[in-house]
Curated annotation (Swiss-Prot):
Retinal pigment epithelial cells and blood plasma. It comes from Homo sapiens. The gene is SERPINF1. This is Pigment epithelium-derived factor. The lineage of its organism: Eukaryota, Metazoa, Chordata, Craniata, Vertebrata. The N-terminus is blocked. Extracellular phosphorylation enhances antiangiogenic activity. N- and O-glycosylated. O-glycosylated with a core 1 or possibly core 8 glycan. PANTHER family: PIGMENT EPITHELIUM-DERIVED FACTOR (PTHR11461:SF84), SERINE PROTEASE INHIBITOR, SERPIN (PTHR11461).
Length: 418
């Protein structure tokens, strides 16, 4: 796990430093050495909670998926809700025999979890992150080729743990598309546009993951302060976009010298937050930051950032994505699911994964719960002004505070979209 090095500039003002002399004796409560004399790091208590451990696993899958998608889209925005894709894969693993199941489980990092009831814990995770106050809508579905006979022993646990039933295609492309669109509309409460892409004839197994989120800040922005301002696409090009501003924003902040970026965290209602990664220089190459993203690293950030007051500007954002993540998953050691998997717990007929579709919508504007910061946020007193302007390419992570789950991730090179 990458160590988080936060050169906060305010550390000295806070009267302490997190750096320690390597020659100093270990403090009380520090890890004990093993038989070789090496320090053995104890697992963070946060990750000892089964649902948090599972959330970390599927989130690490999500960061992997994001990295693959971003590497194939170096000059365009990337928007993903990896949880919905992970949920579809996890649900599909219920119908896999051991060889195929282990392939899916390794991709989802389940091989690092000792929980005997992963699917039961997944239900707890879904119930937590899709609670009404979270403002997150997320759903997944498994669609099978026409006339396939599905075993009831697969359907029952699928419905119990994942709250969904499989769909068998009729063979009529127009009716199948209409039915899937109707399902998406029902799950997303009409927040996502209907797809016009026909279902391919050669479908054997289609996985569908959909999600929508409209954030509500704990402290709303004053819409009267929103104005058109420059957003730097790169060192030479700018565009004018609506920018929200708060001259006295209370946020959590840190400067990571290893990643050459400024990190800020803004709280949302429903026990959620958005973490922003803003490079020190204008660039569309965010690879250094992207390679560092793991559940453990984000958890460390959440613990280490300091509450400050800053001049903040954030672009209004409304993005959507509709497309396949099939090729991305094939690059993530899941190719065998598309070749010769064993899904004999689903049906007696040989079937394989042929397509994975993802639809997502994400939005934030000035809306918030109140006009003053949370009473629990006491900013450090700074002797210099601190600015945090999201007026150049950046990465954001939408994280559930209760479980640590990655819910959305985006690379914003141009706030205008798509």
């Amino acid at each position: 796990m990458q160590a988080l090095v936060l050169l906060l500039c305010i550390g000295a003002l806070l009267g302490h430093s997190s750096c320690q002399n390597p020659a100093s004796p270990p403090e009380e409560g520090s890890p004990d050495p093993d038989s070789t004399g090496a320090l053995v790091e104890e697992e963070d208590p946060f990750f000892k909670v089964p649902v948090n451990k599972l959330a970390a696993a599927v989130s690490n899958f999500g960061y992997d998926l994001y990295r693959v998608r971003s590497s194939t889209s170096p000059t365009t925005n990337v928007l993903l809700s990896p949880l919905s894709v992970a949920t579809a894969l996890s649900a599909l693993s219920l119908g896999a025999e051991q060889r195929t199941e282990s392939i899916i489980h390794r991709a989802l990092y389940y091989d690092l979890i000792s929980s005997p009831d992963i699917h039961g814990t997944y239900k707890e995770l879904l119930d937590t992150v899709t609670a009404p106050q979270k403002n997150l809508k997320s759903a997944s579905r498994i669609v099978f080729e026409k006339k396939l006979r599905i075993k009831s022993s697969f359907v029952a646990p699928l419905e119990k743990s994942y709250g969904t039933r499989p769909r068998v295609l009729t063979g009529n492309p127009r009716l199948d598309l209409q039915e899937i669109n109707n399902w998406v509309q029902a799950q997303m409460k009409g927040k996502l546009a209907r797809s016009t892409k026909e279902i391919p004839d050669e479908i054997s197994i289609l996985l569908l993951g959909v999600a929508h989120f409209k954030g509500q800040w704990v402290t709303k922005f004053d819409s009267r302060k929103t104005s058109l301002e420059d957003f730097y696409l790169d060192e030479e090009r700018t565009v004018r976009v609506p920018m929200m501003s708060d001259p006295k924003a209370v946020l959590r902040y840190g400067l990571d010298s290893d990643l050459s970026c400024k990190i800020a965290q803004l709280p949302l209602t429903g026990s959620m937050s958005i973490i922003f990664f803003l490079p020190l220089k204008v660039t569309q190459n965010l690879t250094l930051i992207e390679e560092s993203l793991t559940s453990e690293f984000i958890h460390d950030i959440d613990r280490e950032l300091k509450t400050v007051q800053a001049v903040l500007t954030v672009p209004k954002l409304k993005l959507s994505y509709e497309g396949e993540v099939t090729k991305s998953l094939q690059e993530m050691k899941l190719q065998s699911l598309f070749d010769s998997p064993d899904f004999s717990k689903i049906t007696g007929k040989p079937i394989k994964l042929t397509q994975v579709e993802h639809r997502a919508g994400f939005e934030w504007n000035e809306d918030g719960a109140g006009t003053t910061p949370s009473p629990g946020l006491q900013p450090a007193h700074l002797t210099f002004p601190l600015d945090y302007h999201l007026n150049q390419p950046f990465i954001f992570v939408l994280r559930d505070t209760d479980t640590g789950a990655l819910l959305f991730i985006g690379k914003i090179l141009d706030p205008r979209g798509p």
